[in-house]
């Protein structure tokens, strides 16, 4: 069933909107109706109708500039939804061997039909991880990182460790998740920016001893923590 044909009052659709608002806001963006439509792949009128109902039901507020924000109840519900999704992603990748993109899609399907008790047991069985497979924190848990910057912003000669892949990439650049996994870039990977690539739209990096050319558009979704000279991965 397409997103356009669902009734916005259904639980799964409410959950989807709340999760989307949570994730966009978590990336530091202002959440506007146009951004929701872009992220979710639905029309502006569909989003407008959904926003009215979410406001009516007390899940979100809308400001004079048309930006939306979760209410306390909305934030609590959204965090619960995101927690379920990220725990399932971790289980699917770590225990069942799914790749990142497939795990994200399967977690979407499973999260609305599995009970809280099962989620809690899955969480315990995989050691209560701090993050999803892409390094995004499971709500209520706090990975200890230093300041994070985009890999695209590192200068030649800089070394860093990958901490997370932006949630934006999961929804707007899904092929990126698969390609990053294929070339060995994931949470905890150490990278060195060696020099500017001949193609101005790329940068050259070393990962696990291999030199790779990575598109800047991909590198901007990869959040890294800068390393000192003693930690140089080359």
PLM regions and their residue ranges:
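Extreme N-terminal segment that seeds HTH/winged-HTH DNA-binding domains in transcriptional regulators
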Residues: 1-41
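Basic, amphipathic "hinge/linker" alpha-helix immediately C-terminal to the N-terminal HTH DNA-binding motif
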Residues: 66-85
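Basic amphipathic alpha-helical segments that dock to polyanions
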Residues: 17, 36, 47-57, 180, ...
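A short, conserved structural fragment
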Residues: 55-65
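Key DNA-contact positions within bacterial/archaeal DNA-binding proteins
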Residues: 45, 101
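Mid-protein regulatory/catalytic core that forms ligand/cofactor-binding pockets
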Residues: 111-221
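Helix-turn-helix DNA-binding elements, focusing on the entry/boundary residues of the two helices
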Residues: 33, 51, 89
